[in-house]
Amino acid sequence: MGSWIPKLLLLQLVLLLTKHADSSSIIKYLPGFEGPLPFELETGYIGVGDEDEDQMFYYFIKSESNPEEDPLLVWLSGGPGCSSFTGLVYENGPLGFKVEAYNGSIPTLVSTTYSWTKVANIIYLDQPVGAGFSYSRNPFADRPSDTGSAKLVNEFVRKWLAKHPDYFSNPFYVTGNSYSGKVIPAIVQEISNGNYICCKPQINLQGYVIGNPVAYYDHDKDSRIPFAHGVALISDELFESLKRSCGGSYSIVDPLNTECLKLIKDYHKCVSGIYQELILKPKCETTSPDCYTYRYLLSIYWANNEIVRRALKVVEGSKGKWERCDLSVRSNQDIKSSIPYHMNNSIKGYRSLVISGDHDMTIPFLGTQAWIRSLNYSITEKWRPWMILDQVAGYTKTYANKMTLATVKGGGHTLEYKPEENSILFKRWISGQPL
C-alpha cells in the first residue's frame, strides 16, 4: 500500500504542473524596480515535444519603437544551460542590476540605455529544457541535444506566433551568443525547412545574429594559443615551439606526443591568471562586489526570491534553485560543426551578422575568421574600421553570402562588455544601414 504513495505524489505534481502550463501573463511591475515598467513585458510557458511535456519559459518584451513592424527576435543564451535572463539583464535588454553589495533584500533593477528593444521585439527564451525556468513534466525525459533543441525552438516559435498572430508578418531573426551560436544556424535551417515543407504559420525568417559563437569547438579552442601569442600573453619562443611540436592542433593531442603536452602545460601556466572572457578584466573572486563577475550573483539572488517568482508567474514547484548558467543541464552536443548549416542558410539567402569581441580568449576572433574563410565566399566589402563619433569601434568585412563579420574593439565573450557599441552595431545592421 505504501509503495503507491510516491507514485501518487508524482501524479499530483504532474497534474499541478499541467494545470498551469502553456500560459502567459502581462507583467507591469517587477520586484526590485521602482514604479511601473517603462516597456511591455510578458512572461509565460509554451509546451513543446511529446504531449507538450517540455515547458519552455520566456520573457517577451515589445519594441519601444514600432512593435507592429519592427523585427521579432528570439534570443538564446549559451552554456548550454544559461538562462536567457542573462541576455535580458546583462547584454541587450532594457533592465540591468545596480551593482552593489547584497544586503539580503531584493537586488535593485534599473533601466538601461543600450537595449535592442529600442528597435526590436525580443523573446528571451530559456532553452534547452532545464535552463532558467524551463522544465519538463516528464521526470524521465531524455537528455537534450543540439539537433533536438533546434527542432524544439522551431516548434516553440511556431506555437508562440500562433498565440501572437499580430507578429506573423514581422521580419524574424534568431539571435544569441557563445554556445547557442553553434545551434542557431541549425534552428534557422529547421525553421526554413518548416516554411518550405509543412508548417503554418509561415515565419517571416530573414536571418540570424551570433556573437562570439562556437562553430567547431576543437578548432575554436585551437585558436586560443595564437591569440595568446598575438596579445603578448606567451613568448615567441613558446609559441614557435608549440607550433613545431603540436602542428597547430592543441585541443586533441596524441598522448604519445609528450613534448607537445609539456608545452601546453607551460602555456596554461602563463595564462592561468587571465580572465578568458575578457582578458582586460582582472580574474578574481565573484563574492567581492569590486569584481566584475559579482553582478552575476545578483541575478541568482533575484530569481530565487519567492516574491520575484510569483511576479514572473513561475509555476510553483517546477524549479528548484535557479542558476544563471546551470552546468547540470548536460546536453548531447551532437552538432560537431555548425559550418554546414551556415552553408545551407547562405544558399537560401538569409542575412547573418557575426559579432566578435576582439579581447575574448574563450572563442577568439581568429577562430571565427577561420571558419568564415572556410565557407569560401567572395568578399563584397573589404576589411575596414567601423566608427562611432569618429572613433574606431571595431572592424568589419562583408561577404557575398550576405554574412557580415564585425569585431568590437575591447569587447569580450558576450555583449555585456561593450553594450553601447554592440547596440549601435545591431541597430545599423538590422535596419540595413552600412556599419
Swiss-Prot record:
Coiled coil: none annotated. It is an enzyme of class 3 (hydrolase). The active site is at S178, D360, H413. Glycans are attached at N103, N344, N376. Its EC number is 3.4.16.-. Probable carboxypeptidase. This is Serine carboxypeptidase-like 14.
